[in-house]
């Protein structure tokens, strides 16, 4: 059976299918970024490819120094997921960086996002939406809000969770660090990318803590790690 489509439609479909392929090499990644308004550097592309091929099956840590473009690297990763129609995406960051994240993703990668905060969240609940996080939109929220709404985040089938300034959660191995432990539990079963310029500051246990957020079984329990 022959399908009658125009040449233009054929090109569009081919382009669409190419973008949906997994980013297992540079060619597929290039397809999802062909419209991006950003000059990528080799190390940013390499970091993104590492995240896709990470030996830590549940995610990776992007730990470039300040100014080397970790946000761009995250944008590359988010763009690829978006192009594959894996659009349940969550960015957790400090409250003062929410608008910056939203602006950069839109301006540089044409990725629309929703900043989830108390007012918009409550309005959604009042409108009968059972879980405002459960949407095929890129959602951005603060660390504090993620802690407060952890139960909703946990119930959402995220394709990817990005945690910016992740060193703020580095003491997750301490039970008294409630924000870190609550967020860790909420995203435990999801693929995660942690972003920090300082994965290790005072103790090797901080690195243990960050890695445990991605996968509890990489280093084993804290007693064995010590």
Model-predicted regions and their roles:
Residues 55-60, 87, 137, 190-191:
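Pre-Walker A (Motif I) flank of P-loop NTPase domains
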Residues 2-49, 71-72, 82-179, 222, ...:
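SF2 helicase/translocase NTPase motor core
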Residues 57-77, 166:
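Walker A/P-loop
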Residues 52, 102, 208-212:
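Short, amphipathic alpha-helical segments that act as regulatory/interfacial helices
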Residues 65, 94, 198:
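P-loop (Walker A) phosphate-binding loop of NTP-binding proteins
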Residues 110, 135, 160, 178-226:
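Conserved P-loop NTPase motor "coupling/switch" region that bridges the ATPase
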Residues 53-54, 80-84, 213, 217:
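Active-site catalytic microenvironments for nucleophilic, acid-base chemistry
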Residues 65, 77-81, 101, 210:
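Hydrophobic residues on the short alpha-helix immediately C-terminal to a glycine-rich phosphate/catalytic loop
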């Amino acid at each position: 059976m022959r399908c009658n489509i125009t040449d233009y439609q054929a090109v569009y479909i081919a382009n669409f299918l190419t973008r949906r392929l997994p980013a297992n090499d540079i060619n597929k990644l290039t397809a999802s970024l062909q419209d991006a308004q950003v000059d990528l550097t080799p190390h940013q592309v390499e970091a993104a490819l590492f995240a896709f091929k990470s030996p830590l099956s549940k995610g990776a840590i992007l730990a470039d120094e300040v100014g080397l473009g970790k946000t761009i690297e995250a944008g590359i990763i988010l763009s690829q997921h978006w192009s594959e129609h894996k659009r349940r995406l969550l960015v957790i960051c400090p409250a003062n960086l929410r608008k910056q994240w939203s602006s950069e993703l839109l301006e540089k990668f044409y990725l629309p996002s929703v900043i989830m905060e108390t007012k918009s969240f409550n309005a959604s609940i009042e409108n009968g939406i059972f879980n405002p996080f459960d949407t095929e939109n890129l959602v951005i929220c603060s660390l504090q809000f993620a802690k407060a709404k952890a139960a909703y985040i946990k119930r959402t089938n995220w394709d990817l969770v990005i945690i910016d300034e992740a060193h703020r959660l580095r003491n997750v191995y301490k039970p008294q660090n409630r924000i870190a432990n609550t967020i860790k539990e909420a995203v435990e079963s999801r693929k995660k990318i942690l972003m920090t310029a300082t994965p290790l500051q005072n103790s090797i246990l901080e690195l243990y803590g960050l890695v445990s957020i991605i996968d509890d079984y990489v280093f084993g329990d804290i007693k064995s790690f010590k």
